[in-house]
Amino acid sequence: MSPAWLRPRLRFCLFLLLLLLVPAARGCGPGRVVGSRRRPPRKLVPLAYKQFSPNVPEKTLGASGRYEGKIARSSERFKELTPNYNPDIIFKDEENTGADRLMTQRCKDRLNSLAISVMNQWPGVKLRVTEGWDEDGHHSEESLHYEGRAVDITTSDRDRNKYGLLARLAVEAGFDWVYYESKAHVHCSVKSEHSAAAKTGGCFPAGAQVRLENGERVALSAVKPGDRVLAMGEDGTPTFSDVLIFLDREPNRLRAFQVIETQDPPRRLALTPAHLLFIADNHTEPAAHFRATFASHVQPGQYVLVSGVPGLQPARVAAVSTHVALGSYAPLTRHGTLVVEDVVASCFAAVADHHLAQLAFWPLRLFPSLAWGSWTPSEGVHWYPQMLYRLGRLLLEESTFHPLGMSGAGS
C-alpha cells in the first residue's frame, strides 16, 4: 500500500503518461495502435434500489435545479417542449395524446443518447418511456414532469433485473439527476433548458476587462491568443503572461455568475460558481499563500487579491450575489492566473486544486501545436480541458470536483 502522501503523486503520474498519448490520439483519429492490446470496457456499476446520482436532492443546483413552474399547452413556455419521434425508443403514451413524447431539448438529447447505450448493452432491447411531460397533475407538487424535464424509463422487455444498470447508463448518458425510484421504473431529469445553471464550468462575462502589457484595458471578448495580460506569478507578484488558448468561449450563451464585491479598495468581479478564486481569512496573509477555492464557496469577510499600487493587495469581501449575463470566456495564460476587473483569479475551474490543474496543462506550454491544432474550436469548450476533466473523474476523489462540473464535459 502506498503512503498517503504518495498516492496523489502516483495518480498524477498516470495523468502525465496519458497526456503524452494525446497528440497521436487527436492527430490520427480513431484506430488501433500497432502492437497495442484492446482495453476492456470500463465496468459499469448498477445503481442500488433507491439510490440517486448525484447524491444531492433533485431540485438543487448540483442536480437538475429548481422547479420553474408547470407548462400547459396554452402557456408561452409550451414552445420549449419538442416531440421525440426516435424509432429506437418506445413511448407508453397511456393518455393517447402524445404527451409522453414531449420534452425539453436537453432531455431529448440525453434520452436519445441513452437509447443507443441500451441497444449496445442489450442487443434486441429498446429503451421504453412510461412517463414524460405530464399535463394532468398525476405527480407530486413541483414535479419536473410538469416542465418536460423528467422521464420515467424501463427497458422494452420490462426485465427489472436490468433497471439498476439502466440507471447507471442514464447517468453516463448525461442526465443531471437519476433515481432508481421504483422497482417498476427509473426516474431521470435534466436542468432547465433556459436556465443558466444548465451550463457551467469556469468563465468570466464577455465584457469583463483585463489589462494588456501596453497598459490598455480590453474586454475578454477582444483578447486573442498571444496577447500578454496582467496575471500573478508563483511568488505572488504581478506579472504579464501570454494567453495560450481559450478553455471555453461562448459569446451567445447565457450563464449564471457569482458576483464578488470588495471594499477598501472597491472591486466587483463576476465569474462562474465552479471557477477558482484566491482567498485568505485575514489581510496579513502573504499573496503567495492565498489559497484557491471555488467562487461559490467565497464568503463575506474573507479576503481576495486585487491589483493596487504597488503590486497586489488584499481586499475584504463585502458581498456575494448572483447574476446572469450573456457570453462567457475562459482564457488560459502561461502562469495559470489572470487579473480580471482588477481581481486576481485562477484560469482553472471544476477541480479544487489549482496547482494540480496548472501541472496538468504543462503539455500546452511545452507543445504549442496542441493548443493551435486544427481541432481547436472557435467556440465552445476546448477538447483538452474536456479530456482532463473526464480523466480526472476516473483518477481523483469525487470531493475534488465542484458539483456543477464543467461546461460541455458531460457532467
UniProtKB/Swiss-Prot annotation:
InterPro entries: Hedgehog, Hedgehog_Hint, Hedgehog_sig/DD-Pept_Zn-bd_sf, Hedgehog_Signaling, Hedgehog_signalling_dom, Hint_dom_C, Hint_dom_N, Hint_dom_sf. Ca(2+) 1 binds at residues 94-95, 100, 130-131. One of its GO terms (biological process) is bone resorption. A lipid is attached at residue 202 (Cholesterol glycine ester). Residues 1-27 form the signal peptide. Ca(2+) 2 binds at residues 95, 131, 134, 136. Its EC number is 3.1.-.-. The record marks 275 as: Essential for auto-cleavage. Zn(2+) binds at residues 145, 152, 187. The record marks 202-203 as: Cleavage. SUPFAM superfamilies: Hedgehog/DD-peptidase, Hedgehog/intein (Hint) domain. The record marks 248 as: Involved in cholesterol transfer. A lipid is attached at residue 28 (N-palmitoyl cysteine). Glycans are attached at residue 282. GO terms for cellular component: endoplasmic reticulum membrane; extracellular matrix; extracellular region; Golgi membrane; plasma membrane. The record marks 272 as: Involved in auto-cleavage. Pfam families: HH_signal, Hint. Keywords: Autocatalytic cleavage, Calcium, Cell membrane, Developmental protein, Endoplasmic reticulum, Glycoprotein, Golgi apparatus, Hydrolase, Lipoprotein, Membrane, Metal-binding, Palmitate, Protease, Secreted, Signal, Transferase, Zinc. Disruption phenotype: Almost half of homozygous embryos mice for IHH died between 10.5 and 12.5 dpc. Also some lethality occurred in late gestation, most of the remaining embryos developed to term but died at birth, due to respiratory failure. Mutants display markedly reduced chondrocyte proliferation, maturation of chondrocytes at inappropriate position, and a failure of osteoblast development in endochondral bones. GO terms for molecular function: calcium ion binding; cholesterol-protein transferase activity; patched binding; peptidase activity; very-low-density lipoprotein particle binding. The keyword Cell membrane applies. It comes from the Eukaryota. The keyword Endoplasmic reticulum applies. Interacts with BOC and CDON. Interacts with PTCH1. Interacts with glypican GPC3. Belongs to the hedgehog family. This is Indian hedgehog protein. The gene is Ihh.
